[in-house]
């Protein structure tokens, strides 16, 4: 697996969390949250992020239930991943994002209680969790 920069996405109908990470340290950092309207991403903003970071690949969280059933957002996340590949000609990898939002909320709670839990931050930290999981699994 080439060393370099990778972008992680936590797809949602209202917001898409974005994180940036690197293979060398298998770590990621929350980057931003991109607004979506009725599940339609802001492709201009996504293009700016991709142009700025020039990633080796894009990682998209795939929402599923604990018992492996697919959620209503699973097909939308798959569609988003396919659109990313088609628009930007980059490899796109899907990662089981089970409990990534719960983990992100827990992290924010540890940082300062309920006052620290902001939806936009949860999404970008969830993207960070997704990306770090992929980086560690693909070593």
Curated annotation (Swiss-Prot):
Q: Which SUPFAM superfamilies match?
A: Ribonuclease H-like
What molecular function does GO assign, one term? nuclease activity
Enzyme Commission code(s) on record: 3.1.-.-
Keyword Cytoplasm listed? The answer is yes
What is the uppermost EC class here? hydrolase
Can you say where in the cell this protein is located? Cytoplasm
Q: What is its main location?
A: cytoplasm
Report one GO cellular component.
cytosol
One biological process term from GO is:
rRNA 5'-end processing
Question: What is a single Pfam family found in this protein's UniProt entry?
Answer: RuvX
Q: Which UniProt keywords apply?
A: Cytoplasm, Hydrolase, Nuclease, Ribosome biogenesis
Disulphide bonds in the chain = none
Supply the NCBIfam families for this chain.
RNAse_H_YqgF
Reported function: Could be a nuclease involved in processing of the 5'-end of pre-16S rRNA.
Q: Which family does it belong to?
A: Belongs to the YqgF nuclease family.
**What is the name of the protein in this document?**
Putative pre-16S rRNA nuclease
What organism does this protein naturally occur in? Legionella pneumophila subsp. pneumophila (strain Philadelphia 1 / ATCC 33152 / DSM 7513)
